[in-house]
Each structure stands twice: as C-alpha cells, then as structure tokens.
C-alpha cells in the first residue's frame, strides 16, 4: 500500500450483492493508492465491516419495513431506497464534511452507485464532487437509455420470423431479447432511466468495471454522449483477491470437492444473487445436469425457487442420484471456484460480474440470461466474442444436457476454449502496467486527487 495521501473518499453502494462487491473492491484499490475510505451503507444488506478493518463504515436508516426487505421486485426496492435515504445521507455527509473541516482533512469526492438518483443535487448543495459508479457493461449502460424510444417503436406481437432480427439501436440484442427487457420493465422504469441519464451527465465523472478490450466502441461513444470523464478501470477482482463482502455465506466444502475432480471436467451452475425460478425449471435443470453425465457444482440459493425454501421440490431419490455425480450447495466462493483447474464451463445468468469473472479465468459459458443487462451480456458472450453457448431462454433438460456435452466433450467446445483463452489474455494485459485499464485507473487517481 502507498503512504496515505491525506485524502478521503466517501463511497455509497446500492445494497445489492452485485453492487456491493465491486464497490468494496474499488475501495480496496483506492485505499492501496493512499486514500482513506468511508463507506456509507443502509441497514438492509449491510456489508460486513469487520472484514474490512481499514475502512470506516457508517450505517444509515433506510426506512424499509420487514416486508419490503423481503421483496423480490428489485426496481420497487431501489425506488423505496431512493425515497427513504435522501435525508439520512444528507445528514451523514454534512457531519462528515464538518468533521473533516475541524480535523483539517480533505474529502476528495463522493463515489456512489449510479442507481442513487438523489445524490447529485445533494453533493452539489454541499460543494462536494461526485462520481457515478456503474456495475453494468458500458454498452448496456449507454444503450439502455433508448429503451423508451424502442418501446414506442416496437410492433407487438413479434412474428416468428422477426424473433432473431437484430435491434439496430441496441446491438447485439435480438428483437426477442428486447421484448423480454421491455416486458419486465415499465414506463415508470423509463422515467427512472431518464433520471439516471440526467444525473450522469451532471456528475464529475463515470467509473466502470470494464476495459477497452471488452467495450471499446461503447467507451468512445459514451465519452461523446455523456461529456464527462469516463474511467474504465478493468474488472475489479483482478486487482485484489476475492472480496469477503458477500451477503451470503459460501459453502467452503466446494473446493476440496473440486480438488477430487479431473481437470476441466466440471460444469459450474449459478444464476446469481437475485434471479428466481419455479419448481418446474428447477427440475429441468436437475434432469439436464443428471442426463449430461458430467460432474457438476450447482448453486441453488436459498429462496431462489418460488414457493419453496431450497430444493424441496426435488424428490429424495433424485437428490441421491444427483449427489453421485455432482454437488449442490446454497452458495459458493465463485471467484475461487472459477479459478479452479477442475472447472470446464459455467452455466450462468450472465450478470456482468459473473460474465467478467468467467472471462478473466478463461472459463467458457453456457448462457441462461433472465432479465435486463443479462440479455445483452449473453449476446456478447455467444454472438460477438463467441466464448459460450446460448440456451436461447429454453430451460429444458434436453437443451441443457446438449449444451453441456457440446461445451465439455465436443470439438465445438475446444474452439470456444481457445477463443476465451485469447480473450482472457487480452483482458489480463489491460490491468497490467501500460494496459488500458491500468492507465485509466491511474487517470482516475490523478483526477480525484486534484479536487
């Protein structure tokens, strides 16, 4: 770690697994460059402060009822948090600035998740520089602002012959992907996106956990669109080992189990921290894994199967059969798993964090996106980078079995592994000295040091 530079940065993540982890990783990066770190966080999904003793954590009241904390409607949750947290955050920032003034310390800036829409005017009123931190792929963040226009232009229902047509204003999405995004979102969601766009353009800068090698065209176009400095500092976890900021407790028995498997023989299955499925879909995945006759490590998150606690829908005799070839856990140390020599493929929902982690470890993917940016990420994996196989939304045992066999056993899988190895090397070079992400990070450090 570099010597303290006397500057403090305040970070404010959204309280979701896919937002907290990258923000804590950013905190580690900035701390290693000499910045003191304060993390403001909600009571809901509070990060584990004891895991990061070098940071200062300040908890604010979020006003969520017990019922609201259990909602699976992410957009509703974010709306409620934005309504409830403005006043507590204002008071928290006011106290931090007053304390810094008394102690003759400089607070450089506020870095908050772009999903917090009240922080721009708040920071401006306190004369505090604000940067927006984004956990999406750059191309999705840039293009998703055209969704209101596409909603007006889309002629429904789609004809069968149109399903695979490209969406020219949102490449490389297909029309069937766009339809799923629009069906899951609402006109109110369009309004929220408009506010994010407005606040982004008013910010002092935008930080992405991506790099030119993954987002080159969108990066240059975004600089023109937003007219603010943009820093693509690379995959967050490539700067430091896995963060211990998970909201779930990983099953550490995964690693010794993987140690007993052959190289590149195991299919790892996880649909992330938010996606839910029904009992029929759970059974189709189970049968697909069983029929593939390949070893598997399957994460079934508690509460991820609608109507049940965990895997109660799978008959006991079938669980015994599954356990002969694979291992089912409630959560896994994903970065550690993907690094393991035994992993041959990743059946994923294609959240951006999971997608980038898979690329960085050279693990080819089977794409099963469910919502929002996952649909775009999956198209990049299967259609642009060609480092994965797309299930095209079909959660069917035969499709899953076939995809696993194609990836692990057939020559198609060998070609995919070669391509993802090349992509891994390109992204890896970006975070090393003189790489694009390394230079962007250095530019960010210099920029926030100048405030």
From Swiss-Prot:
It comes from Arabidopsis thaliana (Mouse-ear cress). InterPro entries: UDP_glucos_trans. The keyword Glycosyltransferase applies. Belongs to the UDP-glycosyltransferase family. Transmembrane segments: none annotated. Its EC number is 2.4.1.-. Keywords: Glycosyltransferase, Transferase. This is UDP-glycosyltransferase 76C4. UDP-alpha-D-glucose binds at residues 273, 332-334, 349-357, 371-374. CDD domains: GT1_Gtf-like. GO terms for cellular component: cytosol. One of its GO terms (molecular function) is nicotinate-N-glucosyltransferase activity. It is an enzyme of class 2 (transferase).
């Amino acid at each position: 770690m570099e010597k303290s530079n006397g500057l403090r940065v305040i970070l404010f993540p959204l309280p979701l697994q896919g937002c907290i982890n990258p923000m804590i990783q950013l905190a580690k990066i900035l701390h290693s460059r000499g910045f003191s770190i304060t993390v403001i966080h909600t009571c809901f999904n509070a990060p584990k402060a004891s895991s990061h003793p070098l940071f200062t954590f300040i908890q604010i009241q979020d006003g969520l009822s017990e019922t609201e904390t259990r909602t699976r409607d992410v957009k509703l949750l974010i709306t409620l948090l934005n309504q409830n947290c403005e006043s507590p955050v204002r008071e928290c920032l006011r106290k931090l600035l007053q304390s810094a003034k008394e102690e003759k310390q400089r607070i450089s800036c506020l870095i908050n998740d772009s999903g917090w829409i009240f922080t721009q005017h708040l920071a401006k009123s306190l004369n505090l520089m604000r940067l927006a931190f984004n956990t999406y792929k750059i191309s999705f963040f840039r293009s998703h602002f055209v969704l209101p226009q596409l909603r007006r232009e889309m002629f429904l229902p789609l004809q069968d012959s149109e399903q695979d047509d490209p969406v020219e204003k949102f490449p490389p999405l297909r029309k069937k992907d766009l339809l799923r995004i629009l069906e899951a979102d609402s006109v109110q969601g369009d309004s929220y996106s408009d506010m994010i766009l407005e606040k982004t353009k008013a910010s002092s800068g935008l930080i992405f956990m991506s790099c030119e090698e993954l987002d080159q065209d969108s990066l240059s176009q975004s600089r023109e669109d937003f007219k603010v400095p943009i820093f693509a500092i690379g995959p967050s976890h490539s700067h430091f080992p896995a963060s211990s900021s998970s909201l779930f407790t990983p099953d550490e028995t995964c690693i010794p189990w993987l140690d007993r498997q052959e190289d590149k023989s195991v299919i790892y299955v996880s649909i992330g921290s938010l996606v839910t499925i029904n009992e029929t879909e759970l059974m189709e995945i189970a049968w697909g894994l069983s029929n593939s006759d390949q070893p598997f490590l399957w994460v079934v998150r508690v509460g991820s199967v609608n109507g049940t606690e965990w895997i109660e829908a799978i008959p006991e005799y079938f669980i015994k059969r599954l356990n002969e070839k694979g291992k089912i856990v409630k959560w896994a140390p994903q970065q550690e798993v993907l690094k393991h020599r035994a992993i041959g493929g990743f059946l994923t929902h294609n959240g951006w964090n999971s997608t980038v982690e898979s690329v960085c470890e050279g693990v080819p993917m089977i794409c099963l996106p469910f919502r929002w940016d996952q649909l775009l990420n999956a198209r990049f994996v299967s259609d642009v980078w060609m480092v994965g196989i797309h299930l095209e939304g079909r959660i069917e045992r035969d499709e899953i079995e076939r995809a696993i066999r194609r990836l692990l056993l057939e020559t198609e899988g060998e070609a995919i592994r070669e391509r993802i190895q090349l992509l891994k090397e390109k992204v890896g070079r970006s975070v090393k000295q003189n790489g694009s992400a390394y230079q962007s990070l250095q530019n960010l450090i210099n920029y926030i040091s100048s405030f």
